[in-house]
Design a protein with these regions (language model features):
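N-acyltransferase acceptor-side catalytic subdomain
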Residues: 1-109
């Protein structure tokens, strides 16, 4: 179990293919997870479908990067059951402040 998660350790874990989890929001204990399957978004070969392009042009949504990292993280953690506890949240915020974690923020309307 990991007691203190700092940004360097978090980056090292991600680079090694593992990530931290907690059993609940209320615990301070962490463990590392090495998933058998991983999701990869191949951005080099990304194709924008006509329907998605139309939705983007509609102006209904606005997309920004790193404008609301803390709120995005809090939203991800704000669930009845979550794997994001306070130590993970703090480490992610520190990593973001150091330039190593980013958010894609999607806003509906103004």
């Amino acid at each position: 179990m990991v007691k203190r998660l700092d940004p360097r350790l978090l980056l090292h874990g991600y680079a090694s293919g593992v990530f931290p989890m907690a059993d609940s929001r209320d615990t301070d204990e962490l463990f590392w997870v090495e998933p058998r399957k991983r999701a990869i978004l191949p951005l080099q070969g990304f194709h924008l479908s006509r329907s998605l392009a139309k939705r983007i042009r509609s102006g209904r949504f606005r997309v920004t990067a790193d404008q609301a990292f803390e709120q995005v993280l809090a939203g991800c953690a704000d669930r009845e059951e979550t794997w994001i506890n306070r130590p993970i949240e703090q480490a992610m915020l520190e990593l973001h402040r150091a330039g190593g974690a980013h958010s894609v923020d999607v806003w509906e309307g103004e």
